[in-house]
Amino acid sequence: MSITKEQILEAVSEMSVMNVVELISAMEKKFGVSANMSVNTNNNSEKSTIEEKTEFDIFLKSIGPNKVSVIKSVRSATGLGLKEAKDLVESAPTVLKENMSKNDAESLKKTLEDAGAEIEIK
Protein backbone atom coordinates (compact mmCIF):
# COMPACT_ATOMS: atom_id res chain seq x y z
CA MET A 1 0.00 0.00 0.00
CA SER A 2 1.48 3.30 -1.12
CA ILE A 3 0.84 6.74 0.34
CA THR A 4 0.05 9.46 -2.20
CA LYS A 5 1.49 12.96 -2.23
CA GLU A 6 -1.92 14.35 -1.39
CA GLN A 7 -2.11 12.18 1.73
CA ILE A 8 1.35 13.33 2.81
CA LEU A 9 0.45 16.99 2.24
CA GLU A 10 -2.78 16.57 4.20
CA ALA A 11 -0.89 14.99 7.11
CA VAL A 12 1.76 17.74 7.08
CA SER A 13 -0.88 20.49 6.96
CA GLU A 14 -2.38 19.14 10.19
CA MET A 15 1.00 19.22 12.00
CA SER A 16 2.20 22.05 14.24
CA VAL A 17 4.97 24.31 12.98
CA MET A 18 7.47 22.73 15.39
CA ASN A 19 6.61 19.25 14.15
CA VAL A 20 7.04 20.38 10.52
CA VAL A 21 10.47 21.84 11.38
CA GLU A 22 11.47 18.56 13.04
CA LEU A 23 10.18 16.61 10.02
CA ILE A 24 12.21 18.76 7.63
CA SER A 25 15.32 18.31 9.77
CA ALA A 26 14.84 14.54 9.84
CA MET A 27 14.35 14.46 6.05
CA GLU A 28 17.52 16.50 5.52
CA LYS A 29 19.49 14.01 7.61
CA LYS A 30 17.92 10.93 6.04
CA PHE A 31 18.37 12.02 2.42
CA GLY A 32 21.55 14.11 2.81
CA VAL A 33 20.00 17.29 1.40
CA SER A 34 19.35 20.82 2.60
CA ALA A 35 16.02 22.62 2.55
CA ASN A 36 17.97 25.86 2.09
CA MET A 37 19.07 24.94 -1.43
CA SER A 38 18.42 27.83 -3.77
CA VAL A 39 16.09 27.27 -6.66
CA ASN A 40 16.46 29.31 -9.84
CA THR A 41 13.04 30.80 -10.48
CA ASN A 42 14.25 33.14 -13.20
CA ASN A 43 12.31 32.38 -16.36
CA ASN A 44 14.67 34.27 -18.65
CA SER A 45 16.64 32.18 -21.07
CA GLU A 46 19.79 33.66 -19.62
CA LYS A 47 22.69 31.25 -19.83
CA SER A 48 25.59 31.41 -17.47
CA THR A 49 28.79 31.84 -19.35
CA ILE A 50 31.82 29.99 -18.17
CA GLU A 51 34.95 31.86 -18.98
CA GLU A 52 37.60 29.59 -20.39
CA LYS A 53 41.12 30.60 -19.60
CA THR A 54 42.91 31.71 -22.75
CA GLU A 55 46.30 32.79 -21.42
CA PHE A 56 48.64 30.48 -19.56
CA ASP A 57 51.94 30.82 -17.72
CA ILE A 58 54.73 28.25 -17.82
CA PHE A 59 56.07 27.63 -14.32
CA LEU A 60 59.42 25.86 -13.88
CA LYS A 61 59.12 23.83 -10.68
CA SER A 62 62.53 22.15 -10.82
CA ILE A 63 65.40 21.69 -13.24
CA GLY A 64 65.81 17.96 -13.05
CA PRO A 65 69.05 16.05 -13.67
CA ASN A 66 69.89 17.51 -17.10
CA LYS A 67 70.47 21.20 -16.38
CA VAL A 68 72.29 21.96 -19.65
CA SER A 69 69.48 20.56 -21.78
CA VAL A 70 66.90 22.55 -19.82
CA ILE A 71 68.93 25.76 -20.25
CA LYS A 72 69.15 25.16 -24.01
CA SER A 73 65.40 24.57 -24.23
CA VAL A 74 64.61 27.68 -22.18
CA ARG A 75 67.02 29.73 -24.26
CA SER A 76 65.42 28.69 -27.54
CA ALA A 77 61.88 29.15 -26.20
CA THR A 78 62.40 32.58 -24.65
CA GLY A 79 65.03 34.11 -26.92
CA LEU A 80 67.22 34.93 -23.92
CA GLY A 81 70.98 34.89 -24.01
CA LEU A 82 72.93 32.02 -22.47
CA LYS A 83 73.63 33.80 -19.16
CA GLU A 84 70.05 35.05 -18.78
CA ALA A 85 68.61 31.61 -19.57
CA LYS A 86 71.03 29.98 -17.10
CA ASP A 87 70.13 32.49 -14.36
CA LEU A 88 66.42 31.98 -15.02
CA VAL A 89 66.68 28.18 -14.87
CA GLU A 90 68.81 28.30 -11.71
CA SER A 91 66.22 30.51 -10.00
CA ALA A 92 63.64 27.67 -10.12
CA PRO A 93 60.88 27.56 -9.01
CA THR A 94 59.97 30.47 -11.26
CA VAL A 95 57.72 31.58 -14.10
CA LEU A 96 59.46 31.04 -17.44
CA LYS A 97 56.96 32.54 -19.85
CA GLU A 98 53.65 34.34 -19.36
CA ASN A 99 50.43 34.87 -21.32
CA MET A 100 50.82 31.99 -23.76
CA SER A 101 48.06 30.30 -25.73
CA LYS A 102 47.04 26.84 -24.58
CA ASN A 103 48.63 25.08 -27.56
CA ASP A 104 51.90 26.99 -27.23
CA ALA A 105 52.00 26.35 -23.48
CA GLU A 106 51.39 22.61 -23.95
CA SER A 107 54.08 22.45 -26.65
CA LEU A 108 56.63 24.29 -24.50
CA LYS A 109 55.76 22.13 -21.51
CA LYS A 110 56.42 18.98 -23.53
CA THR A 111 59.73 20.34 -24.84
CA LEU A 112 60.94 21.30 -21.38
CA GLU A 113 59.78 18.03 -19.81
CA ASP A 114 61.61 16.12 -22.54
CA ALA A 115 64.72 18.07 -21.51
CA GLY A 116 64.20 16.89 -17.92
CA ALA A 117 62.49 19.87 -16.27
CA GLU A 118 59.42 19.66 -14.07
CA ILE A 119 56.86 22.09 -15.52
CA GLU A 120 53.43 23.30 -14.47
CA ILE A 121 50.99 25.29 -16.57
CA LYS A 122 49.10 27.91 -14.59
Curated annotation (Swiss-Prot):
Matching CDD domains: Ribosomal_L7_L12
GO MF annotations in UniProt: mRNA binding; structural constituent of ribosome
Keyword GTP-binding: no
Summary of subunit composition and partner proteins: Homodimer. Part of the ribosomal stalk of the 50S ribosomal subunit. Forms a multimeric L10(L12)X complex, where L10 forms an elongated spine to which 2 to 4 L12 dimers bind in a sequential fashion. Binds GTP-bound translation factors.
Keyword Disulfide bond assigned: no
Biological source species: Buchnera aphidicola subsp. Schizaphis graminum (strain Sg)
Function in brief: Forms part of the ribosomal stalk which helps the ribosome interact with GTP-bound translation factors. Is thus essential for accurate translation.
Name assigned to this protein: Large ribosomal subunit protein bL12
Single Gene Ontology BP annotation: translation
Superkingdom, natural source: Bacteria
InterPro entries according to UniProt: Ribosomal_bL12 (IPR000206), Ribosomal_bL12_C (IPR013823), Ribosomal_bL12_C/ClpS-like (IPR014719), Ribosomal_bL12_oligo (IPR008932), Ribosomal_bL12_oligo_N_sf (IPR036235)
Any matching Pfam family: Ribosomal_L12
HAMAP family cross-referenced by the UniProt entry: Ribosomal_bL12
Family named by the database record: Belongs to the bacterial ribosomal protein bL12 family.
An annotated GO cellular component: cytosolic large ribosomal subunit
Alphabetical keyword list: Ribonucleoprotein, Ribosomal protein
Gene3D superfamilies from the UniProt entry: 3.30.1390.10, Single helix bin
Coiled-coil residue windows: none
